[in-house]
Regions:
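Transmembrane helix-bundle segments that form internal channels/tunnels in multi-pass membrane proteins
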Residues: 1-76, 85, 272-275, 279-284, ...
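Hydrophobic alpha-helical transmembrane segments in multi-pass membrane proteins
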Residues: 3, 11, 42-45, 176, ...
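Alpha-helical structural context
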Residues: 17, 212, 216, 275, ...
Length: 455
């Protein structure tokens, strides 16, 4: 899977830089047809792999180019940026982010109406900031806003953050500022689709658990950290707390990723395995563990969706699913192949994920851990099962993760953390192996046994 993964990465990168030229697209289409003809004549595994890689390169490249090109079309939201006050309708996608003074909404399926004209469906998404909003706006609500559309603008600092491109990669073509009196909710619950109903249910469960933690845990900062660790909700966590974790080199523990999903998979695999072991026939045949692996996919998928399904969560989810299927098929799992499979699936669905910081950090860390352990697997300390050997492995994991993410952190955040290896010995065991398992267990049982979850 390494070659297809490299093809997807190269295609997504080229799509943002080269595919706006028609001759480049024609050249790669010609290359694709050439590989197709070779594959038809010589159907070997290697030829098929190259053919598939060229296909993935084209798909990711053209998809990436189309994402960036939408903003330049005549149907884009861009075209309404200088037309004064408009009637803007859209569907709230994702969870509304409530701050101290304003609420941030992301609108999709946008239509725009000028005074004296019919509504017009526009391409792209809108970020809407509503000031003084008291009533609750939920995911999948259809809303109308009376305001003007502004284009995203970069600061003129050389080498500064490219805010315009950042929003364009998310499909966001404009920004709207409005007061609470300018916003109206149009659509009711009985008109929601199944997908929208699921999104709303998941978001409401995250909010309900966040309120449960706030009422149970006396310290507000502790409650906010527990909420972030278990549900991925960032709006409840003070900026000061996030900065403290970042300076200590432990901000990765706050992101829902491999650690959290592995705990969920492990907890439910053990639970279902215990249940199915009660059947003598399943126990004798050995099918209890395979059925438990399949059953664990249900709560694992639910938790991945509930946490927001960020690129780091997607990577961890796909790798765990590949591992579970390898376990069921009784085949030896390959970490690098699983990582490459995750990259291929994510980039084929959304090539813009390549430019996400969470995607880069997550994949770089895991890649360095996998490659690092191939180098030290014959070291006696790494093969030692004693406490000292486990501490050595733990330190190696932290070191390889730091080495992989070090350049990315420097580039994006202008920050270097020299104490991460030290803090990893304290923070990760305390949070990762005590707080996170307890928090996740509490989340799954609090709807049924709230007193036990509070304990």
């Amino acid at each position: 899977m390494l070659l297809p993964a490299l093809a997807c990465i190269s295609g997504a990168f080229a799509g943002g830089r080269l595919f706006d030229e028609i001759w480049v697209v024609g050249l790669f289409l010609l290359l694709f047809l050439l590989f197709l003809s070779v594959f038809v004549r010589n159907r070997t595994r290697e030829t098929f792999l190259w053919f598939l890689s060229v296909l993935f390169f084209l798909v990711c490249g053209i998809s990436m180019a189309s994402i960036l090109e939408q903003g330049q079309s005549e149907h884009s939201i861009y075209q309404y940026s200088k037309k004064g006050k408009l009637t803007i309708s859209g569907t709230v996608c994702g969870k509304p982010e409530r701050g101290e003074r304003r609420v941030k909404l992301l609108l999709s399926d946008v239509s725009v109406k000028e005074k004296g004209h019919e509504p017009y469906k526009a391409e792209g998404r809108l970020t809407v900031y509503v000031y003084g909003l008291k009533h609750h706006v939920r995911c999948a609500d259809r809303v109308t806003v009376q305001s003007e559309i502004r284009l995203p603008r970069n600061f003129a600092n050389p080498g500064g953050f490219d805010y315009e491109r950042f929003l364009a990669l998310k499909g966001i073509r404009g920004i709207v500022y409005a007061g609470a009196h300018d916003l109206t909710v149009l659509e009711s619950e009985n008109r929601l689709s199944i997908a929208d109903s699921m999104k709303r249910t998941i978001n409401s469960q995250r909010e309900e658990f966040a309120r449960f933690l706030s009422s149970t845990v006396e310290n507000r900062k502790s409650a906010a950290i527990f909420t972030l660790l278990t549900t991925g909700l960032t709006t409840k966590t003070p900026e000061q707390v996030r900065q403290s974790f970042a300076k200590a080199g432990a901000s990765h523990i706050l992101a829902i990723s491999g650690l959290h999903l592995s705990i969920v998979a492990g907890i439910f695999f053990s639970f279902f395995n215990f249940v199915f072991r009660q059947s003598e026939s399943l126990l004798i045949s050995g099918a209890n563990r395979k059925i438990a692996a399949f059953a664990a996919l249900i709560p694992l998928t639910y938790y991945a969706l509930l946490s927001g399904f960020s690129p780091s969560t997607q990577r961890a989810y796909i790798m765990i699913v590949v591992f579970l299927f390898s376990y069921v098929a009784e085949k030896q799992g390959d970490g690098l192949n699983s990582l490459c499979a995750a990259a291929v699936m994510i980039l084929l669905l959304d090539p813009a994920s390549l430019f996400s910081v969470s995607f880069q950090l997550s994949f770089a860390a895991v890649l360095f851990i996998i490659c690092g352990f191939t180098l030290i697997k014959e070291v006696p300390a790494a093969r030692n099962k004693s406490l000292g050997g486990r501490v050595f492995i733990f330190l190696c994991i932290s070191f390889f993760a730091v080495a992989g993410t070090f350049p990315i952190v420097m580039y994006y955040f202008n920050m270097i953390c020299f104490v991460q290896l030290v803090t990893s010995l304290v923070i990760i065991p305390a949070l990762g192996f005590v707080c996170v398992p307890l928090g996740i267990t509490a989340f799954f049982i609090f709807p049924f046994l709230p007193d036990l979850a509070a304990f």
